[in-house]
Amino acid sequence: MDDERFQQAEMNIGMVGHVDHGKTTLTKALSGVWTDTHSEETRRGISIRLGYADTVLTRCPECDTYSVEEKCPECGAETEWLRRVSFVDSPGHETLMATMLSGAAIMDAAILVIAANEPCPQPQTREHLMALEIIGTEDVIVVQNKIDLVTPEEAREHYEQIVQFLEEETHLDPDKTPIIPVSAQHKANLDVLVEAMYEHFEPPEYDLDAPFRMYIARSFDVNKPGTRPSDLKGGVIGGAIVQGEVEIGDEIEIRPGIRVERYGRTEWEPVYTEVVSLHANVTPVERARPGGLVGIGTKLDPTMTKADRLSGQVAGEPDTLPPVRHELLLEVELLERVVGTEEERKVEPIRTNEVLMLTVGTATTVGVVTSARDDEIEIKLKQPVCAEEGDRVAISRRIQRWRLIGHGVIKG
């Protein structure tokens, strides 16, 4: 189908949950794309970086079955396309929480995957849901996965555990949150999940008249080793457009940009480049708008973009981007207890000279607290961020590893 409405996804849906609960398998069942493509990911069997895949939700006009197929799996009739969506498959491994947090910044809605063959909740189930709450993602569907590995009685007991967890520990109302039993491995009950995604997830409304702005989540060098200099392609950046539109030929600015040493001091300079190609998932487009994940081919030196070097930066129309901040004044709200640890731990107040990890948009940076009062902290960043006043920030503290302890709002 060439309908322009379906060239670009209307929204980003995060796949979140504990390690090995089946997020990547479910993404593949829904999109046909295995998102663990990084060699280390394939070897270790876990997602390390954010993986992306698109799919189109469809419905059969004959028998009303929902699916992601062009031909109805029940009666074979041609299906109607309803909505294109992008999946952000985030890592569930506890040491990779920073990557999950930066992914949450570009999620409009989320599917929380909980394996039926393990007690609920597991540590990262708690932590991922808290991350969604902090970043402000309200639309969540719970998938009770791996139901092929348990008896009907065990599945019912496990369902009750999920309901209790949602009621007692989360911002979600179990009466309004769909909980759908699925076997991603066997593609069982996917029709019910697709219907819930279409009915429950509302694509956000974007300001298309505002200046173009995009959070960069990945950056690449697409050239193979040994490519002739005359055939080299410029660097590629990928991420989520949050406002405005961009066209081939537009000039864009990237902040904070590149680090330069000048008179013994480190400074950051914005980078300017031209858009030479645009891809919505794998579809080449002339113009891109918010919704889904977009790849932008540029004239940048590919060494600048390889291995996610520009991940966490912000691209946009020149002279319209937020300021680059080396220090942040945050109004903070801490959680009552640490999420993600096996044992219960109270969140202690933030102290001066403490080192914290902050996630601002898709950027993750470390900083030292220079001043700490009850609900306000000042923090000097190791790497600057491009951010507006009023932006939300996820705050993590080192407790064996980085643990989510609360959030802040940028005051200056």
Swiss-Prot record:
Cellular component annotations (GO), alphabetically ordered: cytosol
Family to which this protein belongs: Belongs to the TRAFAC class translation factor GTPase superfamily. Classic translation factor GTPase family. EIF2G subfamily.
Positions of the UniProt region annotated as G1: 17-24
Cofactor(s) for this UniProt protein: Mg(2+)
Native source organism of the sequence: Methanopyrus kandleri (strain AV19 / DSM 6324 / JCM 9639 / NBRC 100938)
Domain of life: Archaea
Residue numbers spanned by region G2: 45-49
Stretch list, region G5: 183-185
E.C. no: 3.6.5.3
Protein name: Translation initiation factor 2 subunit gamma
Reaction(s) catalysed (UniProt annotation): GTP + H2O = GDP + phosphate + H(+)
